[in-house]
């Protein structure tokens, strides 16, 4: 978000950050304990999901980073244009409340 304001961590518990290559690259929404919905153009190698982050300080959120188990895209998606720009991310199942 450009020009956004920090919010209380409990206001948007379903929001996550997508992080890879030492930088934040996008966001997503928790659908349930196993799945995150994001835009396909936010895909990256060795992506991690950061949950319960109140600020964009990813270095302080090491304990809230999880690896991606698998990513799914539309079969007939065209990368050359923003077409069917949806990515489902399966995350490892754990006992977290996030």
From Swiss-Prot:
<dbReference type="InterPro" id="IPR050127">
    <property type="entry name" value="Serine_Proteases_S1"/>
</dbReference>
<dbReference type="InterPro" id="IPR043504">
    <property type="entry name" value="Peptidase_S1_PA_chymotrypsin"/>
</dbReference>
<feature type="glycosylation site" description="N-linked (GlcNAc...) asparagine">
    <location>
        <position position="94"/>
    </location>
</feature>
<dbReference type="GO" id="GO:0005615">
    <property type="term" value="C:extracellular space"/>
</dbReference>
<keyword id="KW-1204">Blood coagulation cascade activating toxin</keyword>
<dbReference type="InterPro" id="IPR001314">
    <property type="entry name" value="Peptidase_S1A"/>
</dbReference>
<dbReference type="GO" id="GO:0006508">
    <property type="term" value="P:proteolysis"/>
</dbReference>
<dbReference type="GO" id="GO:0090729">
    <property type="term" value="F:toxin activity"/>
</dbReference>
<comment type="similarity">
    <text>Belongs to the peptidase S1 family. Snake venom subfamily.</text>
</comment>
<keyword id="KW-0800">Toxin</keyword>
<keyword id="KW-1199">Hemostasis impairing toxin</keyword>
<keyword id="KW-1202">Platelet aggregation activating toxin</keyword>
<dbReference type="InterPro" id="IPR001254">
    <property type="entry name" value="Trypsin_dom"/>
</dbReference>
<dbReference type="Pfam" id="PF00089">
    <property type="entry name" value="Trypsin"/>
</dbReference>
<dbReference type="GO" id="GO:0004252">
    <property type="term" value="F:serine-type endopeptidase activity"/>
</dbReference>
<feature type="domain" description="Peptidase S1">
    <location>
        <begin position="1"/>
        <end position="98"/>
    </location>
</feature>
<feature type="active site" description="Charge relay system">
    <location>
        <position position="85"/>
    </location>
</feature>
<comment type="subunit">
    <text>Monomer.</text>
</comment>
<keyword id="KW-0325">Glycoprotein</keyword>
<comment type="function">
    <text>Thrombin-like snake venom serine protease that preferentially cleaves the alpha-chain of fibrinogen (FGA). Induce platelet aggregation in the presence of exogenous fibrinogen. Possesses esterase and amidolytic activities.</text>
</comment>
<dbReference type="InterPro" id="IPR009003">
    <property type="entry name" value="Peptidase_S1_PA"/>
</dbReference>
<keyword id="KW-0645">Protease</keyword>
<feature type="active site" description="Charge relay system">
    <location>
        <position position="41"/>
    </location>
</feature>
<dbReference type="InterPro" id="IPR018114">
    <property type="entry name" value="TRYPSIN_HIS"/>
</dbReference>
<protein>
    <recommendedName>
        <fullName>Thrombin-like enzyme cerastotin</fullName>
        <ecNumber>3.4.21.-</ecNumber>
    </recommendedName>
</protein>
<keyword id="KW-0378">Hydrolase</keyword>
<keyword id="KW-0964">Secreted</keyword>
<keyword id="KW-0720">Serine protease</keyword>
